[in-house]
Amino acid sequence: MKSIWFHFQGYRDLPDDFTEKYDSVWVTPPNDVLCDPEMAGKYFNWNLEELEYADEMGFDGLGVNEHHSNAYGFSCSPNLVAMPLARRKSQAAIVVLGATLPLYNPAIRVAEEFALLDCVSGGRLVAGFPVGSAMDTVGVYGTPPTMVRPRYYEAHDLITQAWTRPGPFAFNGEYNKLRYVNPWPKPLQTPHPPIWLAGGGSIETWKFATDNNYTYNYLSFTGYQNSRALMQGYW
C-alpha cells in the first residue's frame, strides 16, 4: 500500500460565526471581507512547507488540486504549487488531482504544463483529470452544464494525443481547433504519465476510468462507511 499526503490548502482564519453569516465556503464567500491577501500568501508558504515535510517523512506521493472562489481549498492553480515540489530531489510522486479539464480552452495548456512538470520532476508526475465540481465549472467559470462532459472528453483526447502523437499535427474538435499541436517538451514518462480520475461517484466517470484503464480516486466527504458502500458498486 502507498500513502499520499494530500493538501486541500484551505483558508485557515474564517470567523467563528461563518456558518451563521454565510451560505457556503464556495463561490459566494466575499473576498474583501474574509480573505486577507497577506495571510493567503503566508498560508500558501505554510502549505508548501507541510508538503515538503511530508516528502521528508517518506510519503509516496504529494497531492495538490484545483478549486476556485473557495475558502476551504483556495489553490486555483495546482501546477504552480506542484512546480517547487517537482524540483526537489525526491522519490515521491507529484500527484496533481488535478486539472479541471472543462475549464481550459484550449486544453493544450494542460498538456504543456503537465509535460513540463513531468520533465522537471524526473518522471514523477501523476496527471489527474477530474471533470470538476459544478461550483467550479458552472458557478465560477460559467461553463454551460450540458457542455461540461463534452468539453472534458474532447480535452482528454487532445491532451493524450499531444503526448503520444508525433508533432506537429492539427486537431479539429468542437471546442479546440488547433492548426499545430506540438508541445515542447513532451512528458518524460512514456507513453505518458499515469492518468488518475478523481470523482464523487458518477457512473459516467467510473465507466470512463474502466474503459481507459485509469486509476479511479473517490473523493470521500461522507466518511468511511458510505465510501465503502459506494466503492463496492464500482468494483
Per-range role (PLM):
Residues 1-2, 58-61, 89-94, 120-125, ...:
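Short, well-ordered coil/turn segments that N-cap beta-strands
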Residues 1-88, 193:
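N-terminal beta1-alpha1-beta2 module of alpha/beta enzyme domains
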Residues 2-40, 103-170, 216-218, 222-226:
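Flexible, glycine-rich active-site loops centered on histidine and acidic residues
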Residues 42-53, 113, 199-207:
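Short, acidic/polar
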Residues 50, 81-85, 110-114, 155, ...:
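A general structural detector for well-ordered alpha-helical segments in enzyme core domains, enriched
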Residues 52-56, 82-91, 114, 118-125, ...:
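Acidic (Asp/Glu)-rich catalytic clusters
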Residues 150-187, 191-198, 208:
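Extended catalytic-interface subdomain
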Residues 201-235:
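A conserved active-site cap/scaffold subdomain adjacent to cofactor or substrate pockets
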